[in-house]
Amino acid sequence: MQAINLTDHFLIAMPRLEDSFFAKTLTYICEHNEQGALGLVVNRSTDLSVEKLLTQLGMSPQDPALSNLPVLLGGPVQVDNGFVLHEPVGAWRFTLSSNVVTGLTASIDILQAVADCQGPEKILVALGYSGWAAGQLEQELAQNAWLTVPAQSRILFELSFEERLPAAMKLLGIDFFNLSNEVGHA
């Protein structure tokens, strides 16, 4: 069996995940290899704005637009830790590159740069991440828990969090409300 690599892809939760954390989620896969996968849910916001988060961290945000940018709930793992998905990649401490332009950073230096208007051009800030052990994501895919599609920067950074899942579904030519809870194999 050939290994798949879903780095820089979206995972679209199938309706059968209705009762789980991942119900109706769109997850961006930042890294996927033989050791497992790491991603961020990109369509579930918290009640916290990026401006409030930075202020709570003792920073003085300079950009008023940060008050309208919600902090996302990136996943059920390490929900007390912040993660910044951004373009361009840049030279931050603790950055994982998903592709040549998109990075995931988990260090305070990028948040300070955002507060000082010196950060990356495009950002999503999340608390927590989504993680899969080796082979776990592949098993969930075989059980029809997810649809996959190559990610698009436009969906991540230009659409509101509410618009992201329908836009990713549209890439597959599918309306989310037409999906069935039933699975089958041809």
From Swiss-Prot:
Matching entries from InterPro entries are given as:
AlgH-like
Q: Which GO terms describe its cellular component?
A: cytosol
Pfam families referenced in this protein's UniProt entry, alphabetically: DUF179
* Superkingdom per UniProt: Bacteria
Q: Which residues form a coiled coil?
A: none
PANTHER family listed in its UniProt record: UNCHARACTERIZED PROTEIN YQGE, UPF0301 PROTEIN YQGE
Q: Which family does it belong to?
A: Belongs to the UPF0301 (AlgH) family.
What this protein is called in its record is UPF0301 protein Neut_0448
Tell me the organism's taxonomic lineage: Bacteria, Pseudomonadati, Pseudomonadota, Betaproteobacteria, Nitrosomonadales
